[in-house]
């Protein structure tokens, strides 16, 4: 008859894996937040780099605007945020978005949409698309690094 002897280290390894499985959702949430933070920071930088125009400049210029007023830019920066986590099946989702209104009671989402798509009064300037594309690699690396750190903390 076959005999199986298990090294005492295997029990520790199995308990570490069980603990890791139990805490996997928390690890994924922390890692996803780190990636979202990098993308949100890049979006903030892109919005902050947009040219600022005064109301007078906008009225005098017959060309479509390429920038924002100071109030619009401040409204976008204050309305930019990261949503709460949402679990969708086996996925953990987090969204970065813009909400609220600026000092002139203009919806921030309408302003950013007019920038992304362009309108008759504003030239297309896809700041969010540009920011997310530029931050994708850094966000993926941050997620991987955070996940590795969290796993090492729990296993060792």
Predicted regions and their residues:
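Short, Lys/Arg-rich flexible segments
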Residues: 1-95, 99-156
């Amino acid at each position: 008859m076959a005999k199986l002897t298990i090294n005492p280290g295997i029990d520790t390894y199995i308990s570490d894996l069980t603990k890791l499985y139990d805490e996997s959702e928390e690890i994924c949430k922390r890692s996803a937040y780190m990636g979202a933070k990098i993308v949100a920071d890049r979006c903030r930088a892109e919005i902050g780099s947009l040219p600022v125009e005064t109301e007078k400049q906008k009225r005098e210029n017959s060309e479509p605007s390429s920038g924002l007023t100071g109030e619009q830019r401040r409204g976008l920066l204050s309305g930019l945020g990261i949503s709460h986590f949402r679990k969708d099946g086996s996925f953990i989702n987090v969204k970065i978005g813009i909400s609220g209104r600026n000092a002139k009671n203009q919806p921030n989402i309408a302003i950013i949409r007019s920038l992304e798509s362009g309108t008759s009064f504003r030239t297309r300037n896809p700041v969010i698309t540009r920011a997310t594309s530029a931050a994708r690699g850094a966000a993926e690396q941050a997620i991987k690094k955070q996940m590795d750190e969290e796993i090492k903390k729990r296993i060792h």
